Each structure stands twice: as C-alpha cells, then as structure tokens.
Swiss-Prot record:
Keywords: Cytoplasm, Isopeptide bond, Phosphoprotein, Ubl conjugation. Through its interaction with ARL14 and MYO1E, may connect MHC class II-containing cytoplasmic vesicles to the actin network and hence controls the movement of these vesicles along the actin cytoskeleton in dendritic cells. The keyword Phosphoprotein applies. Residues 158-177 are annotated as: Disordered. Its main location: cytoplasm. This is ARL14 effector protein. Pfam families: ARF7EP_C. It is found in: Cytoplasm. The gene is Arl14ep. The keyword Zinc-finger does not apply. There is a cross-link at K176 (Glycyl lysine isopeptide (Lys-Gly) (interchain with G-Cter in SUMO2)). It comes from the Eukaryota. The modification Phosphoserine is found at S182, S266.
Length: 276
C-alpha cells in the first residue's frame, strides 16, 4: 500500500499503515476531516497540505486522536531541563497554544505538555487576569478559517531534502557533553548499531533515545533525518546507543536491548563518544 501524503512530507513513510494503535488500514483525504482536526494536524506537523492530500489511519491516530496521550514529557519551551520532566504534566489546549505562542514568540503546539516548573514560569510572566486573557484569545471561527486558508499545497521539492521551517520547534539542546554525560550512559562501537533509517540493526526496532519502547518521538525534530526519536545526535548509521538515562526525580531507565548489541560493540570507555 502506498504511503500517505503526511508520511511522505514528514519522511515517516515506514510508519504508514502500522496497526499498533488501530486494527484498520487505509486512507482519508484531508477534506474528510473536521475543520478542527485539520487545524490540529497543521499545527502539530507544521505542514501545508490541500484537502485532496491523504493521511493514513495510523497517522490519524498519531497526530489527531492520540497525540495528547503520546506526549510523555514536558515540551520544555524555555530549554531549562537537563533531564526529561515526566511528572504532573498538563496539556496545552488550542487556545492556550495560540495565546502563549504569541506571548513568548515561540511555537507551542496544542497537545504538548508542560511540567509544574514551566507552568510557574508562564504564570509568572503572563501578568494578565483570566478576563483579559479570554478577550485576547483569537476568535475560534476566525482562527480556524485563517488556518484552513493557509492549507495550500506547496511542492517541497525532493522529498529527501524536506525539513521543517526554521521558525518551528527548536531542536532539544542535548548536545553539550557536560549535560549528556551527567544523565546518560553511552555504549560506543566501531561498527554501526543503527541502519541508514535509524533502526537498530540487531532487532529492527525503531527505539526512541528516551528508551521508552512505546514512545513515538519526544525530542525536537532531528535536523538530519527529521525524526523526533533522535536525541543528541541523529540515529541514522550511528555507532553508539544509550545504555541508560536518568530522568527528573532520579529515576534510571535502562536500555533493555543494550545486551543484544554487545556482539556489535567493541570495549572502550563509555564516554569516549562524547569527546568527538
């Protein structure tokens, strides 16, 4: 079965028609979606599509029906977290996303989640009462109409060169060796651990770098491959993997699949990879 338009533009065609969240396979055209669902799809993917473009039933679940449930950590809009914050989260709704994006000048997506610390920062910075905030929320019909008018398809050119617009969600800042070494144990190797699509060679699993097997991507889009499952470095053809990570609260998450990779790995210091 051919991939859907959403999968093609996001370069996630390998995910099209998966039956992990739905038993059915097939397509919907975007004009079959409600105006609210079309708006959410646009904001959550950063894409522009026409009503004749298609979305497979798997991507409907991922970006519309179950998007909120699949957000497992704080979106960290202020880049303050050294570790993933996964406790006491609350969802950013459509009106809040619109209001806060305008207020802070950065894209906040409906369905993302905030931890108590980021919520306190927002509450401390947004010095308006509820009535004022309500008046400043855009008119729902007007916002939807404006967004739908922008759903015009633009050929992005060669699909392998597709990248989200620069003004969209920034890549999570996990590249500093000092912060990476403090909460992530790394196993390096001389040979590749991941294939050219970012899948583990020894198992074929599309494992997120947060090590949650059910996670469908919780990092900012990788500038190299576009995946939201790549942490500090793109997984495509990567020669190392995370053995464990530490999240806020001191909880350690171990990579259950690390043992299977030992046959591919050569002995060396766990942090040698950070000296590159």
């Amino acid at each position: 079965m051919d991939p859907c338009s959403v999968g093609v533009q996001l370069r996630t065609t390998h995910d099209c028609h998966k039956t992990f969240y739905t038993r059915h396979t097939g397509f919907k055209t975007l004009k079959e979606l409600s105006s609210n669902d079309m708006l959410l799809l646009q904001l959550r993917t950063g894409m522009t599509l026409s009503g004749n473009n298609t979305i497979c039933l798997h991507h409907v679940k991922i970006y519309i029906d179950r998007f909120e449930d699949l957000q497992k950590s704080c979106c960290d809009p202020f880049n303050i977290h050294k570790k993933l914050a996964k406790k006491n989260l609350h969802v950013i709704d459509l009106d809040d996303a619109t209001f806060l994006s305008a207020k802070f000048g950065r894209q906040l997506v409906p369905g993302w989640k905030l931890c108590p610390k980021c919520t306190q920062i927002i509450n401390g910075s947004v010095d308006v009462d509820s009535d004022d905030r309500q008046r400043r929320k855009p008119d729902s019909d007007g916002r939807t109409a404006k967004a739908l008018r922008s759903l015009q398809f633009t050929n992005p050119g060669k699909q392998t060169e597709f990248a989200p617009e620069g003004g969209k969600r920034e890549k999570r800042k996990l590249t500093k060796a000092t912060s990476a070494a403090s909460d992530r144990q790394i196993i390096p190797a001389k040979s590749k651990v991941y294939d050219s699509q970012g899948l583990l060679i020894f198992s074929g699993m599309d494992l997120c770098d947060c090590l949650d097997e059910d996670c469908l991507g919780c990092f900012y889009a990788c500038p190299t491959c576009g995946s939201t499952k790549c942490g500090a470095e793109c997984r495509c053809d990567r020669k190392w993997l995370y053995e464990q990570i530490e999240i806020e609260g001191g909880e350690i998450i171990h990579n259950k699949h690390a043992g299977k990779a030992y046959g591919l790995l050569s002995p060396c210091h766990p942090y040698d990879i950070l000296q590159k």
